[in-house]
């Protein structure tokens, strides 16, 4: 071939390339409790560009946890722009945005002006702890439980059984919103004037992205607020009436994978479709491809969340695990049962602030350098103790400290406490959920710690699959968005794209840990009811 022919061939190839449509991508964004992160995904589910910023929580008083909405909005916009730039693509190549968020963190704002009345009140916030205790011990709750137990006896209704076991929690938005109405007159007045909007982070971001033209949430987020009736698939008139919250301030509830509207062009230069809103744990479940009944996900991030796919049916539980909507896509409805421990990554970050180590990655080697923690035990309870103990007044503590205790013992005790809490949650799942476990898949930043992963596998005597990609909430949001716009054909295609990095198998028997865990449980019991004011 002559030089002239070669040049002509190259020109034809260049023209052909320029004529072909540009590659398409989807965005998966997760607003976690610690980090806000965005990934750009191609059609092989490979991350092409990323950006992350630390979520700056505000602590106005002990036990209060807030997020500045203006700061969060600036971070949200920045990580999307930076991720797209890092991917080396253009905004007009983004065909869909999926948003995963920490759940039950809420805000209220002026319906007419869009201005917020206060900061986001985090799901970790404990300002309503006394209100929760008061309500759970109230005559109203005792009458409700008694009446529904009788009704369940005669009707065998699952709804009545669930209501008979219902208790308020500080993690629900319910009584934190009640606290706001009792203490912020501006919000109370706006509610009375029908000028107040309530929203979890997903709802507020959608409202901001669409310049107020879209106001909605999805079923996964709604089901974690404490206001939602998952049996009737609507906001609960019973709960809202009990706590005097008008239904009018709650947003419409839509499918998880759904066209919620397009981003206002002024924000990113193009109208990117917002096609998925999802709670972070449900999103991680979807990202892990836990699509079958019995599939289990163990997320270890800021907190630990253990979820099991219960199929189309909600599980009526005994107050440890709680029923949730996993996702709703058209006619497909998937339900979950979930249990959680509030302080996992939180405990590790706290230890880092104390200069016990400089990088969380060091903790694995520190723990493995010792035979044991030398009788030191840590209770991870900065935000109270969740199921099966359910004590918002518990305190975080070290017990068993000695002259010989050093930072290595403290670090190992912290990591062991995470594994012990995992064991408690898994045992509770086995007791309460009458569904055989098929697979266990882990995700979240703490699952990068092989010491915690191996100890958890030993304690529960099960294999645990760790994926190649840890940011499952981002991937789940992107997957849901991709399905909505035809970027991926179906869930079967997503399953084929999933990659496993390592499977942890039990190496020690439970009996080798039994005495250690019994002593840890003693430490936990001594930390309970510490902040009780009555």
UniProtKB/Swiss-Prot annotation:
Enzyme Commission no: 2.7.1.30
Localisation: Cytoplasm
Organism listed in the record: Mus musculus
Positions contributing to glycerol binding: 103, 280-281
Main localization (coarse): cytoplasm
Pathway listed: Polyol metabolism; glycerol degradation via glycerol kinase pathway; sn-glycerol 3-phosphate from glycerol: step 1/1
Family per similarity comment: Belongs to the FGGY kinase family.
Cytoplasm is among the record's keywords: yes
Gene Ontology CC terms, in alphabetical order: cytoplasm
Effect of substituting residue 443 to N: Reduced glycerol kinase activity
Gene3D superfamilies noted in UniProt: 3.30.420.40
Name the UniProt record assigns to this protein: Glycerol kinase 5
GO process annotations (BP): glycerol catabolic process; glycerol-3-phosphate biosynthetic process
Function statement: Skin-specific kinase that plays a key role in glycerol metabolism, catalyzing its phosphorylation to produce sn-glycerol 3-phosphate. Involved in skin-specific regulation of sterol regulatory element-binding protein (SREBP) processing and lipid biosynthesis.
InterPro entries to which the protein is assigned, alphabetical: ATPase_NBD, Carb_kinase_FGGY, Carb_kinase_FGGY_CS, FGGY_C, FGGY_N, GK5
Residues binding ATP, per UniProt: 33-34, 302, 345, 445
């Amino acid at each position: 071939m002559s030089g002239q022919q070669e040049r002509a061939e190259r020109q034809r190839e260049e023209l052909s390339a320029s004529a072909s449509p540009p590659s398409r991508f989807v965005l998966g964004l997760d607003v976690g409790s610690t980090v806000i992160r965005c990934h750009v995904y191609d059609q092989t589910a490979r991350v092409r560009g990323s950006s992350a910023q630390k979520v700056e929580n505000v602590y106005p008083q002990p036990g209060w946890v807030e997020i500045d909405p203006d700061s969060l909005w600036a971070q949200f916009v920045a990580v999307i722009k930076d991720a797209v730039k890092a991917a080396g693509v253009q905004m007009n190549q983004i065909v869909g945005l999926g948003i995963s968020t920490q759940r039950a963190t809420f805000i209220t704002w002026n319906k007419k002006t869009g201005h917020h009345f206060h900061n986001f009140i985090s799901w970790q916030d404990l300002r309503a702890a006394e209100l929760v205790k008061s309500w759970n011990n109230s005559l109203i709750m005792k009458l409700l439980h008694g009446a529904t137990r009788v009704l369940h006896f005669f009707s065998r209704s699952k709804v009545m059984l669930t209501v008979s076991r219902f208790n308020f929690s500080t993690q629900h938005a319910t009584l934190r919103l009640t606290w706001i109405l009792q203490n912020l007159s501006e919000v109370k007045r706006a509610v009375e004037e029908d000028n107040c909007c309530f929203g979890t982070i997903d709802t507020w971001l959608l409202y901001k992205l669409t310049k107020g033209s879209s106001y909605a949430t999805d079923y996964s987020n709604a089901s974690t607020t404490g206001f939602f009736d998952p049996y009737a698939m609507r906001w609960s008139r019973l709960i809202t009436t009990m706590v005097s919250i008008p239904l009018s301030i709650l947003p419409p509830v839509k499918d998880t994978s759904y066209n919620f509207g397009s981003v206002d062009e002024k924000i990113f230069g193009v109208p990117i479709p917002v096609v998925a809103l999802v709670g972070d744990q449900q999103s991680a479940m979807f990202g892990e491809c836990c699509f079958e009944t019995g599939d289990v996900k163990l997320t270890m991030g800021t907190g630990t969340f253990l979820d099991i796919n219960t199929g189309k049916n909600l599980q009526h539980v005994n107050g440890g695990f709680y029923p949730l909507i996993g996702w709703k896509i058209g006619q497909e409805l998937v339900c979950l049962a979930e249990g959680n421990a509030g302080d996992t990554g939180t405990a590790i970050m706290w230890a880092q602030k104390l200069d016990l180590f400089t990088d969380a990655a060091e903790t694995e080697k520190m723990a493995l350098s010792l035979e044991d923690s030398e009788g030191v035990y840590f209770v991870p309870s900065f935000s109270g103790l969740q199921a099966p103990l359910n004590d918002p007044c518990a305190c975080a503590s070290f017990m068993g400290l000695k002259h010989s205790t050093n930072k290595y013992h403290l670090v190992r005790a912290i990591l062991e406490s995470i594994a012990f809490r995992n064991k408690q949650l898994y045992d509770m799942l086995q007791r309460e959920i009458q569904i055989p476990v098929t697979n266990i898949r882990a995700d979240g930043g703490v699952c990068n710690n092989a010491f915690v992963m191996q100890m958890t596998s030993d304690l529960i005597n099960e294999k645990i699959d760790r994926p190649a990609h840890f940011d499952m909430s981002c991937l789940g949001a992107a997957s849901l968005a991709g399905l909505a716009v035809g970027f991926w054909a179906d869930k079967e295609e997503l399953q084929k794209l999933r990659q496993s990095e390592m499977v942890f198998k039990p190496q020690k028997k439970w009996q080798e840990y039994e005495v250690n865990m019994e002593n840890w449980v003693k430490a936990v019991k001594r930390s309970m009811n510490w902040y009780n004011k009555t």
